[in-house]
């Protein structure tokens, strides 16, 4: 299965029981910042934005004072799981990032998708990739 298939079929799909509710954008990005696969709507990010995200996984709390930036959009960092999940909020939407052994799984959402639904979609794929040694 290609990485693009993971994005298309496991991130950018209608959320169970909520037809038409899906993430706004999603991607799988290597720890080095290389994009493995992404939705057409995933923002173009800067290397320093990815560096900040990776630093926060290694030093939890790093992004809290400045916020999480991705593609020029600033998200307020909210409670995640230190070293495993970063969550951010911006207005009625937000972002969830799950770290696996080799990659970061990104999900970006807007209403009517809820933070919990985004977390479920992103973390389920991230946990699967971890189980596969990825």
From Swiss-Prot:
Subcellular location, record wording = Cytoplasm, Cytoskeleton
Q: Tell me what PTMs the record reports for this protein.
A: Phosphorylated by MAP kinases.
A cellular-component GO term for this protein: cell cortex
Gene Ontology molecular function terms on file:
actin monomer binding
| Residues the record lists as Phosphothreonine modifications | 114
Motif (Involved in PIP2 interaction) spans which residues?
84-100
* InterPro entries reported in the protein's UniProt record: PFN, PFN_euk, PFN_sf, Profilin_CS
Q: Which UniProt keywords apply?
A: Actin-binding, Allergen, Cytoplasm, Cytoskeleton, Phosphoprotein
Phosphoprotein listed as a keyword: yes
Question: Can you tell which superkingdom this protein's organism belongs to?
Answer: Eukaryota
The record describes the protein's role as: Binds to actin and affects the structure of the cytoskeleton. At high concentrations, profilin prevents the polymerization of actin, whereas it enhances it at low concentrations.
* Further details from the record: The variability of the residues taking part of IgE-binding epitopes might be responsible of the difference in cross-reactivity among olive pollen cultivars, and between distantly related pollen species, leading to a variable range of allergy reactions among atopic patients.
Q: Which family does it belong to?
A: Belongs to the profilin family.
Under the subunit heading, UniProt states: Occurs in many kinds of cells as a complex with monomeric actin in a 1:1 ratio.
Put simply, this protein is called Profilin-4
